[in-house]
């Protein structure tokens, strides 16, 4: 699939703006964002006016806009990096591509800039293969195919719900690892896309992700978070939890999730030691979350994404709520998210 074959009217690019001056960011992405509709969501705590260069088809949402859409009491859900979720909420397009404002286009091993938007759409348009692992990675990629022994009955694949891209430079590490390995950088460009196997868990990150909003939009849920989380961080509990919810719901509904290409280049940001001081509680919560998701089975009656999120929230409150109040708050946030999703989209 080439850029000429992509229906740009089906794609929204969502950018959570934590920096007021987006000139350098958008200029670097102009060759790949041109012609697409952009949703820029301003961090509600950012006081400065946004600086956006001309030549983009863009809608900007501020704290005032959030309050008009979801109410003042609910706008607190969208602080810091969580502001990107507001973009997911108000979009009306089939596909969402989310890229953080501290990222620029990466270069492939040949020195060419990577068109992350096109690669994400290619990943989403082609089926996923979560039920039988293809050792040649994505069999739908150019130059690849199904390996020896791959069942013909499974070669049609399943719909792809999400494309989880990667990034170079600032490595995708948690705070303890980054604090110990302060000079560690990701320089490995792996030219591959693969489907995450069914029943396997993974974190996601809005730093570089795309998803089919029509298939799984409500599953991208801002829920489990720590006090003060959402600004500059290595380990963001909300992203990790969201990924586990998205993957479990995708497995339940028969969808697939891909990871690998495209890469972006992530600039330096944050302090790992400071992040560790704030977020070590989150690591303990994750140790409780993994066995929960491992044993969780959603009811067969949950046929819609919204139903799955509600059932998941119910299980979280019943099975994890007594362990930590953060889980109870997460369950309540998941229910609230579905209510907001239904309200905003029913009024469209």
From Swiss-Prot:
Matching Pfam families: RGP
EC number(s) on file: 5.4.99.30
Keywords tagged on the record: Cell wall biogenesis/degradation, Cytoplasm, Glycoprotein, Golgi apparatus, Isomerase
Cofactor(s), names only, from the UniProt record: Mn(2+); Mg(2+)
Motif DXD motif: positions: 100-102
Cellular component GO terms, alphabetical: cytosol; Golgi apparatus; plasmodesma; plastid
Residues marked Required for activity (site): 148, 155
UniProt xrefs under InterPro entries: RGP, RGP_fam
Enzyme class: isomerase
The UniProt record lists the keyword Glycosyltransferase: no
PTM characteristics: Reversibly glycosylated in vitro by UDP-glucose, UDP-xylose and UDP-galactose, but not UDP-mannose.
Compartments where found: Cytoplasm, Cytosol; Golgi apparatus
Disulfide bridge partners, by residue number: none
GO terms, molecular function: intramolecular transferase activity
Glycan-modified residues: 148
Tissue spec: Widely expressed at low levels.
Example GO biological process: plant-type cell wall organization or biogenesis
Catalyses which reaction(s): UDP-beta-L-arabinofuranose = UDP-beta-L-arabinopyranose
Family: Belongs to the RGP family.
Job description of the protein: Probable UDP-L-arabinose mutase involved in the biosynthesis of cell wall non-cellulosic polysaccharides.
Self-association and partners: Heteromers with RGP1 and RGP2.
Entry's free-text remark on domains: The conserved DXD motif is involved in enzyme activity.
Protein's recorded name: Probable UDP-arabinopyranose mutase 5
Organism: Arabidopsis thaliana (Mouse-ear cress)
